[in-house]
């Protein structure tokens, strides 16, 4: 492991707030994006020098933001770069393959001539009212989430450039957001000292974590302490992260109280138990502010080496058939951990004069980049095999996103009758736990079904009644077994649905039949009863429809009022 702080004016010696490596199988070079107070986003190329240290080469200057840029994040494929800043907008950049540079009014001609790559803005996402602090992509690259000073978190449809949902439960700045690699959760961390975990399918809060029990008081009462730092923490960011397989959630800015002592820490949450942390990673120095995981999976170390290295047994973060490495950045240092032990195996300090701001791993795990508000960046390089032996094949993940859930829902509705399958699917969906970690894509197609089924009774008075029609046809068929011709009329006439069910209504309507149909009186046998039904159908609508439409309109308005809160909560 070698550390070097490059003497480069990354952003005109202004504070550097964020950096991110480009991942993806199609890219042959280590491309790095950086952003800072000078309102620019810059692209760099990294190589390993003969001495094993990093060599940096400038590639492009992306000038479009009007204020400081707080975060840059490449999409999972590396094709699109998202940047968010104090101007409350998110820009989506894409590299332009054409050799002719794009005419940009935001940068000088001299700066444009220095660009070796041409990047253009393909989308501008507007929705936040204040500074954008953090961005995280979904695993499939179709969706993205952002956190802002306006206390909100927004889920974006990247292809359409539109907002899908807005989460506004936080009471203060949202300084970090991460998307579960399996697509089930979105976790946010705010300076209101609350960690909120949202369910992406239900689009609502699944867990609120803010306090932890610390034992009993002198009188036997339960004591608790706040798990996260308040707004006095000297950092704009609290960048939390899921592990690449989604098994663990790592949250910085933690504080553990033991009597009068307060220890800065990073909490570790298990996917199977998100209500409280399973472990914490203490930081001897200042508060932690960012956690980033190496994208490479490694083989487990031999048990003998683990036992020799640890004097006492580790609290065992998680029992996995592989090992994952992650870095935790505090205000003045970086600690390196893996999932096989609870204490760090690496420690980097005394590299910057001011607070650190962000960290990022290269796609092969060879580089760890560190940015600081002093205007410089540091690179930690690892030799081949220094972190461990990489797995030959990555684990296969079953990914769920709101977009795929909607598509599956539409497919089930298009390919099945609305009456039978929707009712049959309801009990099975209610018995399953949608928040269970070991879920497959098949339950996700059924997870939205309960909400649609609950809404179906309220939608019946509005004019579309898929469920009652089959049942009404079954009740009318015994009354007219020998009448095959009038059946089309009964299907098209909605006014026959109410009085055709019960016999008392037919008895009350016998005087109307004699008044409205005087001509067919000579036919008074059993056949006239069937013939009278035919002329009544066109004769009764002037009287029956007002009785049926009025309650339907009233019910429709009532249902609209009742459905308004539910729909708003789903779309938020």
Curated annotation (Swiss-Prot):
Residues 546-559 have a biased composition (Basic and acidic residues). The modification Phosphoserine is found at residues 416, 436, 456, 465. InterPro entries: CAF1_p60_C, CAF1B_HIR1_beta-prop, Gprotein_B, PTHR15271, WD40/YVTN_repeat-like_dom_sf, WD40_repeat_CS, WD40_repeat_dom_sf, WD40_rpt. WD repeats lie at residues 11-54, 64-103, 127-166, 169-208, 228-279, 301-347, 351-392. Residues 411-430, 511-529 have a biased composition (Polar residues). It is found in: Nucleus; Cytoplasm. Acts as a component of the histone chaperone complex chromatin assembly factor 1 (CAF-1), which assembles histone octamers onto DNA during replication and repair. CAF-1 performs the first step of the nucleosome assembly process, bringing newly synthesized histones H3 and H4 to replicating DNA; histones H2A/H2B can bind to this chromatin precursor subsequent to DNA replication to complete the histone octamer. Residues 431-452 have a biased composition (Low complexity). One of its GO terms (biological process) is DNA replication. Coiled coil: none annotated. This is Chromatin assembly factor 1 subunit B. Keywords: Acetylation, Cell cycle, Chaperone, Chromatin regulator, Cytoplasm, DNA damage, DNA repair, DNA replication, Nucleus, Phosphoprotein, Repeat, WD repeat. It comes from Mus musculus. GO terms for cellular component: CAF-1 complex; chromatin; cytoplasm; nucleoplasm. The gene is Chaf1b. The modification N6-acetyllysine is found at residue 501. Residues 403-572 are annotated as: Disordered.
